[in-house]
Amino acid sequence: MSRYRGPRFKKIRRLGALPGLTSKSPKAGSDLRNQLRSGKRSQYRIRLEEKQKLRFHYGLTERQLLKYVRIAGKAKGSTGQVLLQLLEMRLDNILFRLGMASTIPGARQLVNHRHILVNGRIVDIPSYRCKPRDIITTRDEQKSRALIQNYLDSSSHEELPKHLTLHSFQYKGLVNQIIDSKWVGLQINELLVVEYYSRQT
C-alpha cells in the first residue's frame, strides 16, 4: 500500500487530529457524529483506526509501519513504547517537532531535496534514525535557509519536547536524548496498534 496523498481533511474528520499530516483540526463534535453515524464500532475497527492514525500521522506506507512493528517486537521493553520511539526519532519527524517544517510530509521534502545536514553531512533519507548528540542543520545555501526560516516564522511555537533543543538563529537543532513516551506528538493507544498486527499474523 502506497503513502497517502489524498484529501487530508477527510482523514482527520474520521480519525481525529493528525498534526504530522496537517495543521488543520477536525470540527468540534465531528468525532461524535462519526460514532453516531457508524453505530457501535467493532474491536477490529477500533484497532484498525488506531493503526491508521499512526500510519497517516507519520506518513508511512503499510509495509514501512509493519517493518517498524517487527523491529519493536524484537527489542527489549514494551513493543508499543519502542515503536513510538522508533517513529519519533526519524529525521523527518525530528524536523517537524523542531518546528523546522510545518508537517512531516514537508519535512520529508526538505530531506529528499538535500537541504538538511546531520553532523555536517547531507542526509537525504527521511527515515534516518536520529541518535542522542546528533546535530541537525540546514545547508548554507540561501534557498535552504529561506525555506526553514519560513517554517520557523509560521510555527505555533509550542513547547519543544525535552529530548530536543532548537537554536533558530543558527538554523540548528540538537537531539539531547531518546524521546520519553510522554512527549510523543500524537494522542494514540499504541497497544491497540500492536494488537492489530499480532492478530494479522
Swiss-Prot record:
Q: Which SMART domains match?
A: Ribosomal_S4, S4
Q: Where in the cell is it found?
A: Plastid, Chloroplast
Q: Which SUPFAM superfamilies match?
A: Alpha-L RNA-binding motif
Task: State the Gene Ontology terms under molecular function.
Answer: rRNA binding; structural constituent of ribosome
Question: Which intervals hold domain S4 RNA-binding?
Answer: 89-149
Q: Which UniProt keywords apply?
A: Chloroplast, Plastid, Ribonucleoprotein, Ribosomal protein, RNA-binding, rRNA-binding
Identify its protein family.
Answer: Belongs to the universal ribosomal protein uS4 family.
Q: Which NCBIfam families match?
A: PRK05327.1, rpsD_bact
- Spell out the PANTHER family in the cross-references: 30S 40S RIBOSOMAL PROTEIN, SMALL RIBOSOMAL SUBUNIT PROTEIN US4M
- The identity of this protein, by name, is Small ribosomal subunit protein uS4c
Q: Which organism is it from?
A: Platanus occidentalis (Sycamore)
